[in-house]
Swiss-Prot record:
This is Mycothiol acetyltransferase. Monomer. Its EC number is 2.3.1.189. Acetyl-CoA 2 binds at residues 233-235, 240-246, 272-277. Catalyzes the transfer of acetyl from acetyl-CoA to desacetylmycothiol (Cys-GlcN-Ins) to form mycothiol. It catalyses: 1D-myo-inositol 2-(L-cysteinylamino)-2-deoxy-alpha-D-glucopyranoside + acetyl-CoA = mycothiol + CoA + H(+). GO terms for molecular function: mycothiol synthase activity; protein-N-terminal-alanine acetyltransferase activity. Belongs to the acetyltransferase family. MshD subfamily. It is an enzyme of class 2 (transferase). InterPro entries: Acyl_CoA_acyltransferase, GNAT_dom, MshD_Acetyltransferase, Mycothiol_AcTrfase. Keywords: Acyltransferase, Repeat, Transferase. Acetyl-CoA 1 binds at residues 79-81, 87-92. CDD domains: NAT_SF.
Length: 296
């Protein structure tokens, strides 16, 4: 039985988390992003659940943007199917339902763009409309940090920094379907994550004006020993050209290395050539690519 569920009960939440772990173990990559895990306990997403008896055989998360969302926002779906329930048409049926429910422009993420996902997309007549690279590098032999005299860098101090952080984030990512248009609630959700460390959120200010110019939010993967992440690097468009992206990224890398981590990863849009060049100069290389499929 497959049905849309407005609110997941504790049993289903637990089974879905176990299903995600099982699929990750089978495929070598997580089938859904961290946002899906946050939304399991809320009402911000639509939940499509396929059950085999009392067990969850597949789960689809669908986020439909509201009227206040970025104009670039589209409905986004993420799907996980139990390894034992695959090749039975469950996944394709659920994707069809998501495309109908989400409306025109709906996209479905395929993490790692695995052959099975490519085959399903071909079957449904979908094409890759967006690609997101995961890049990695070792945290050894980092370049030295050189801070321009016109800039100061410090870590996050508390709620007094929130309005400036939102301002820069939403200016830097005004074009981005997920990262743009953040509210105080979006910050609060991430501050509530077990991995959040205020000492790992770095803010760059102009020395003369004290204005926030950019930030780098780092993340330590608690479930992957030795792994860190360049979670978000955002620079105010008005401050572009001052080398802040390079500086902030490097400050965060040194912080992660100081925690004893061995490897760092980040995600970047495949068509963001400026960011790609910055990260390549810092020694990052593409490790895998996620694809968002939809109708052309």
């Amino acid at each position: 039985m497959t049905e849309w569920v407005p609110l997941l009960d504790n049993r289903r939440q637990l089974q879905i988390r176990e299903l995600i772990v099982e699929a990750t173990r089978a495929d070598g990559i997580a089938p859904v992003g961290e946002q899906v895990l946050r939304e399991l306990r809320g009402t911000g997403a639509k939940h499509l659940v396929a059950e085999d008896g009392d067990d969850v055989a597949a789960f689809l998360n669908l986020v439909v943007p509201d009227e206040a969302a970025s104009e670039n926002a589209t409905a986004m779906a993420e799907l996980v199917v139990a390894p034992a329930a695959r090749r039975r048409g469950i996944g394709s049926a659920m994707v069809r339902e998501a495309l109908a429910e989400g409306g025109a422009g709906t996209r479905v993420w395929a993490h790692g763009d695995l052959p099975a996902a490519q085959s399903l997309a071909t079957k449904l007549g979908l094409v890759a409309l967006r690609r997101l690279h995961q890049m990695r590098r070792a945290l050894a032999d980092l370049p030295a940090i050189r801070v321009d005299a016109s800039v100061t860098v410090r870590h996050y101090l508390g709620p007094q920094d929130d309005s400036d952080l939102l301002r820069v984030n939403n200016a830097a990512f005004s074009w981005h379907p997920e990262q743009g248009g953040w509210t105080p609630g979006d910050l609060a959700d991430r501050f509530a994550e077990p991995w959040f460390d205020p000492r790992g959120l770095f803010l760059a200010h102009d020395v003369q004006t004290a204005k926030l110019l950019g930030f780098h939010w780092t993340k330590r993967h608690l479930d992957k020993p030795g792994m860190g992440e360049v979670y978000i690097v955002g620079v105010d468009p008005a401050a572009q050209g001052r080398g802040l992206g390079h500086l902030l990224t490097l400050v965060g890398l040194h912080h992660l290395a100081g925690l004893g981590l061995e490897t760092v990863l980040l995600y970047v849009e495949s068509d963001n050539q400026a960011a790609l060049r910055t990260y390549e100069r810092l020694g990052f290389a593409v490790a895998l690519t996620d694809a968002a499929y939809g109708r052309a």
